Each structure stands twice: as structure tokens, then as C-alpha cells.
Swiss-Prot record:
CDD domains: UBCc_UBE2N (cd23813). Gene3D superfamilies: Ubiquitin Conjugating Enzyme. The modification N6-acetyllysine is found at residue 83. It holds the Pfam family UQ_con. Residues 3-150 form the UBC core domain. It comes from the Eukaryota. One of its GO terms (cellular component) is extracellular exosome. This is Putative ubiquitin-conjugating enzyme E2 N-like. PROSITE patterns: UBC_2 (PS50127).
Length: 153
């Protein structure tokens, strides 16, 4: 494996030394470009409150010129996450900038988790329900959180 760029080493050291509240991110023992991430649903009144959501984050060889790849590993009912657990977040697509860091990506995912954006959907069936019957969509999201995200502590 190629030597890790200094930037990735520094970002990883900072993540481990100064963890973001509600987020745990650790590099894999065998691949320092692959991170095991757990983000807690902490926002009051969020349907994801109390859940712990696992993700995987992969830094491509081109990082930071290319955005990290992020996928949910915990099933979630969210308009910005599709059935393949891919996430729709502008900074992971057309708004990516090499000035952004892993920490920024994780904070943005945490914010999106707590405040879904139906105007940038990835899961059309979920966003349809979110727009036509938000109360039912929120209840479904709470049920999925209880079912899939509260069983691992």
C-alpha cells in the first residue's frame, strides 16, 4: 500500500485527539483510508434521537481532490439516504472542495441526520411520504430508529 499522505495522517490524529461530540470515527487497522464511523442521533425532537448510526467512510487515492465515499451501515428511513444506504449530501457531490476535511464531512452528515432535507432527495418513496404526510414519515423514521439503531450499545 502506498504511503499515507501527510494530510490524512494529520486529519486522523486530530479526529482521535479531539473527537467531535456525538461522533466516533476510527481508521481501520488494515486500511487507514477506511474509517468506521458511528454518529449518534442526538437532536431533541428528531425521529433519530437515541439511535446510533454506523457508517463507513472511504478516502479515495485522489483525496482531497475527490470527496470521500460515505455509506450508512445502519438501516435508516431518511429522505436523503437510499435503499443502498448511499447518502445525498451536496458536499459529497458537486459542492466538494479540497479545503473540506473529514471532520467537516462528519459534522455535515450529523446535521443532515438531525434535519432531513426533502429538497435534495435520494429515496423518492421516502421523500414523497415526507412531503405528503410528514407526521407519518417521522413516525416511520422513529420506528426504524428503534428497530435498527437502538440495539447496539
Amino acid at each position: 500500500m502506498a504511503e499515507l499522505p501527510h494530510r490524512i495522517i494529520k486529519e486522523t490524529q486530530r479526529l482521535l485527539a479531539e473527537p467531535v461530540p456525538g461522533i466516533k470515527a476510527e481508521p481501520d487497522e488494515s486500511n487507514a483510508r477506511y474509517f468506521h464511523v458511528v454518529i449518534a442521533g442526538e437532536s431533541k425532537d428528531s425521529p433519530f434521537e437515541g439511535g446510533t448510526f454506523k457508517r463507513e467512510l472511504l478516502l479515495a487515492e485522489e483525496y482531497p481532490m475527490a470527496a470521500p465515499k460515505v455509506r450508512f451501515m445502519t438501516k435508516i428511513y431518511h429522505p436523503n439516504v437510499d435503499k443502498l444506504e448511499r447518502i445525498s449530501l451536496d458536499i459529497l457531490k458537486d459542492k466538494w472542495s479540497p479545503a473540506l476535511q473529514i471532520r467537516t464531512v462528519l459534522l455535515s452528515i450529523q446535521a443532515l441526520l438531525n434535519a432531513p432535507n426533502p429538497d435534495d432527495p435520494l429515496a423518492n418513496d421516502v421523500v414523497e411520504q415526507w412531503k405528503t404526510n410528514e407526521a407519518q414519515a417521522i413516525e416511520t423514521a422513529r420506528a426504524w430508529t428503534r428497530l435498527y439503531a437502538m440495539n447496539s450499545i
